[in-house]
């Protein structure tokens, strides 16, 4: 008799990153069967996520030793064995969506950098690799995709080109796997590389829970009767600890309110009434994958992503909220993502910079300059730990461009 299939939550988040149209979404579909531009943008009941999430089980065939995401080996027909469940995060590759990609990068435990064989290394390839470097992500596999569009000599040429491109970066020793996502060619080799080079991070379930919020929603349909209304839903990824149905939670920095003509933020507490992970309702949720948290909050507070960038945890156990920051700054030599090579000029006093911290983004006005240090006044406060990494972007022309990173100091 067949055993009842036990549901497992994803245990690792793997980013699909790279230049627009290099095949990230097609590759995610080849690995998971889910087209993330529509399906995973819906966490059931119409919850939309701008960054696509899709879960898959990585399985290994005990007979031929090849990897797949199918219960039956597509290569020899034997039953496969479960290795682990992973969540693929499909990040936008368009230059205008770089800050969205950075929010997703903060949740990635590893990444597949997708480079199309017909185009090679492009501006957003560089930008996404630098984003991974800035958020401190070292577990990288490179997929040289669309090999069906070029001849063998071109594939070898691209391979050498990529080797040169990653020298001196976090991806210097990353394996480069030639694949065709469209035809499923070499996908088993890519999965084997993911298993070898992107380990599941160790999480202590007894640490205070912390979840970074990516989206938030009002799931009530227009015209719902008052007695049928359900509370606001928060979507994000747990980075430590665990959350349970019935837990009291605090959300920081919380909700904005006006006082003496100034906008201030107030933390809010509520109760978890439901949890979704991998599209299923669960009693407990752990780090890995996207988690939907149903709350008792007024849905007015959560509609249209109003809660994005917040941090969720147990009352009194969350990091501090900052409306001013002191950063130890590391500037890049060149601006990342532009067609032409531009030198990164020093940061100036009174300059406005865009800061990404976890899933939060805020503008910061530079109020003080020191040696390798800056002080900023923030437009929107952030909840973060001392020592947290901050991605720093500057407006270059009409776009925000990565120019460096910093660490929060006391």
From Swiss-Prot:
GO biological process terms on file: formation of translation preinitiation complex
EC code(s) of this entry: 3.6.5.3
Membrane-spanning residues: none
Residues annotated to bind Mg(2+) 2: 21, 46
UniProt cross-references to NCBIfam families, sorted A to Z: eif2g_arch, PRK04000.1, small_GTP
Subunit structure: Heterotrimer composed of an alpha, a beta and a gamma chain.
Primary role: eIF-2 functions in the early steps of protein synthesis by forming a ternary complex with GTP and initiator tRNA.
Name of the protein in its database record: Translation initiation factor 2 subunit gamma
Taxonomic lineage of the native organism: Archaea, Methanobacteriati, Methanobacteriota, Thermococci, Thermococcales
